UniProtKB/Swiss-Prot annotation:
GO terms for biological process: symbiont genome ejection through host cell envelope, short tail mechanism. It is found in: Virion. Residues 106-166, 192-240 are annotated as: Disordered. The keyword Transmembrane helix does not apply. Belongs to the phi29likevirus proximal tail tube connector protein family. Residues 127-160 have a biased composition (Polar residues). This is Proximal tail tube connector protein. Forms the proximal part of the tail tube. The gene is 11. Keywords: Late protein, Viral genome ejection through host cell envelope, Viral penetration into host cytoplasm, Viral short tail ejection system, Viral tail protein, Viral tail tube protein, Virion, Virus entry into host cell. Transmembrane segments: none annotated. It comes from the Viruses. Residues 112-126, 193-205 have a biased composition (Basic and acidic residues).
């Protein structure tokens, strides 16, 4: 009950007095926009509603420290505009300091540079000897059969020309100059001469058929033995000069939770850090209310 001015709840509930059955939280939610109908700086816009609700609940039963609610709202706005930039920095530092889901952050950076010079000299001597023996035994049987048929025919004409002369010679006084049957030579003497000249012509026709069959059987055997012997000597020299330069950059960031502390505990610590800043704000805002209880 108010003794000097008016309680903050009177102003908040004034905006829902025509409605019945509302809870305190519902009444606060209806009156909150009427109380904070001005702008002021805050670190996170999503936190504005939470901060205003906590303010009303913290001073819900307290009497305002000014004659009228209008004067109270004026000084409330002035206080927030002057002091909230400072407290916003505290809120932001807590956000940087506390990630609600991690309790460790480790960063490792390393740079490694290696320069290596390598000289290799290698002498290699190799003797190779190989002996080989090969044997070949081959036998081949060949059989062949040849069958042939040859047939020939021919026709022609044969002419026989026969000349015959019979001479009888006695002693004579006169000489004859006669040629022989072939017209060559001279017969100088004959007592009696008989000549016969015969011409014969006949036609000829021949036909010949020949069948041939031949069988050939052969066997060949090949035996061969060979031996080989190879020797090789090799000598080599290898030289290798190499230079290796390597640079390694290693960057590691480890972020997370280490230890037995649960995620629920981490979130609770984060919220408590914000509430501690709120409590400092509300302690300093006591000057806006009557210092009587």
């Amino acid at each position: 009950m108010s003794s000097y001015t008016m309680q903050l709840r009177t102003y908040i509930e004034m905006w829902s007095q025509g409605e019945t059955g509302l809870s305190t939280a519902e009444k606060i939610e209806k009156g909150r926009p009427k109380l904070f109908d001005f702008n002021y700086p805050i670190f996170d816009e999503s936190y504005r509603t939470i901060f205003e609700t906590h303010f009303i609940r913290n001073f819900y039963m307290r009497e305002i420290g000014f004659e009228t609610e209008g004067l109270f709202k004026f000084h409330l706005e002035t206080w927030l505009m002057i002091n909230m930039p400072y407290f916003n920095k505290l809120f932001e530092s807590e956000l940087i300091k506390y990630d609600p889901l991690e309790n460790t952050r480790v960063g490792v950076k390393s740079n490694t540079k290696n320069d290596t010079d390598r000289n290799d000299n290698r002498d290699v001597k190799q003797d190779l000897t190989s002996n080989g023996t090969s044997s070949t035994d081959a036998k081949q049987n060949d059989t062949s059969k040849t069958t042939g048929n040859e047939k020939s025919s021919g026709s022609g004409s044969i002419t026989d020309d026969n000349f015959k002369r019979d001479l009888n010679a006695d002693t004579a006084d006169d000489r004859l100059q006669l040629t022989t049957k072939d017209g060559e030579g001279v017969l100088e003497y004959a007592s009696q001469i008989e000549e016969h000249n015969e011409n014969k012509k006949r036609d000829t026709k021949t036909s010949n058929t020949t069948d041939t069959t031949s069988n050939t059987t052969g066997t060949s055997t090949l035996d061969s033995d060979s031996k080989t012997s190879n020797k090789a000597n090799t000598t080599s020299n290898d030289k290798l000069n190499s230079q290796i330069n390597s640079v390694e950059d290693y960057i590691e960031d480890r972020v997370g939770k280490i230890g037995t502390q649960s995620y629920a505990r981490l979130v609770m610590d984060y919220r408590e850090a914000l509430l501690r800043i709120e409590q400092r704000i509300f302690n300093e805002m006591q000057e806006l209310f009557m210092l009587v209880y």
